[in-house]
Amino acid sequence: LQATAYICLVIATLCWGGNSVAGKLAVGHISPMMLTFLRWFLAVAFIAIISVPQLKKDWPVARKNLPLLLCYGAIGYTLFNAMLYSAVQYTTAINVAIEQAGIPMLIFLLNFFFFRTGISLAQCLGFGMTLMGVALTAAHGDLATLLQLQLNRGDGLMLIAIAAYSLYTIFLRWKPPVDWRTLMAFPALAAMLTSLPLLLWEIGRGAAQWPDQAGWSITFYTAIFPSLLAQILYIKGVEAIGANRAGLFINLVPVFGTLLSVVLIGERLQSFHMVALMLTLGGIAIAEKGRPKASAPTVPASPVD
């Protein structure tokens, strides 16, 4: 049973790690906002197939919490992915993959400032290391560029994406008591609706690009694998080995994203990438190890939906 759970969690994080690579491969084949809209349009169709009976059961509870569920989709699904797919137009998929490791750090900071969650010395050290790794990546190995406020446009957009997903995760503490299919379906529908104005804006600028054959392949990948399959496998993994242990597998997302960027795109893995990976993953590991037991999460949020 544990082996099956591990396989499910590895495949889930592999799918999520491939999202930034898919965004990079989409350049020249489909525009960012078009990809965001079509991804969630297709995802809604796929999710509806497995969710409609459950949605009817959960509707009384979901209706009372509709604004919150729609907020999940607008921030965690639309804004995150729109910024990510825009970011890879200007920076490497490796950078985008590594920078996502900053999400746990920002979640920690938001929890501390708004909810005064416990903090340990190990957590301070760990998240300091993670911050250094993300900063090193965003600065392309030259921290002096940050001091001069010369941040690459793509890395800047990715920082917005990280902030959006961190806020989404914080809001999950108020998630309604509904089935996981309902918790996927309504935010996905909200993502489809809120990504439409972004698509219209892109069309108005004359920057929209309808997908070609490769673009459609990428769109179907993002709609099926990161949006649906990864979510299902992650939930199965959590059910089998518990949320805390399953949450550790999320740290594989930047690793898989980096490896896939090298193998599939042929991006060059530079020395600062290696240092940044060691800093971010090492920092997360130290922070997790030093987490006060009382503040351990019961349900870690699935990343990079």
Regions found by a protein language model. Give the residues of each.
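Specific alpha-helical transmembrane segments that line the substrate/conduction pathway
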Residues: 34-45, 81-123, 161, 243-263
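Specific transmembrane alpha-helical segments of multi-pass solute transporters/efflux pumps
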Residues: 15, 19-20, 48-100, 136, ...
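Helix-helix packing/entry segments at the starts of transmembrane helices
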Residues: 36-38, 94-102, 170-193, 223-263
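Glycine-/small-residue-enriched transmembrane alpha-helix faces in small-molecule transporters
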Residues: 1-34, 145-174, 193, 260, ...
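Hydrophobic transmembrane alpha-helices of multi-pass small-molecule transport proteins
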Residues: 47, 119-141, 195, 251, ...
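Membrane-interface helix termini and inter-helical loops of multi-pass transporters
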Residues: 21-29, 86-89, 138-151, 200-218, ...
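Hydrophobic/small/kink-forming positions within alpha-helical transmembrane segments
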Residues: 17, 21, 73-78, 82, ...
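Hydrophobic alpha-helical transmembrane segments of multi-pass integral membrane proteins
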Residues: 3-8, 34-50, 71, 122-135, ...
